[in-house]
Amino acid sequence: STFGACRLCTVEDDRGRLFASCSEEPRDGMVIYTHTERLRKHRKLIVELLLAAHCRDCTTCVKSGECKLQELAHNMGVLKVRYENYNEIRPVDYSSPAIVRDPNKCSCLF
């Protein structure tokens, strides 16, 4: 089953209902809108909230310039984050020789 936590795939049906497309099965006769003004505003807000919960060390991050979240924020016109980050800084997990897991970079894993 799909968790649908990020909500970036939110779509709108012909009744005005917003829902995550990744967690809804298509049905015959469904009318789905993917690029309405309402959806653009909604997705922009979601990106701002993701950034608010995200560690803000972008300029020193190894993914800077290649970060999908940075790219998404830029493409959506998010120039600043209007919300405070209230998450505590958690330790980075270097226990694997192949993977560095930084829980401060992904709000969906805690």
Which residues does each predicted region cover?
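Short, surface-exposed loop/turn segments at secondary-structure boundaries that line and modulate
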Residues: G4
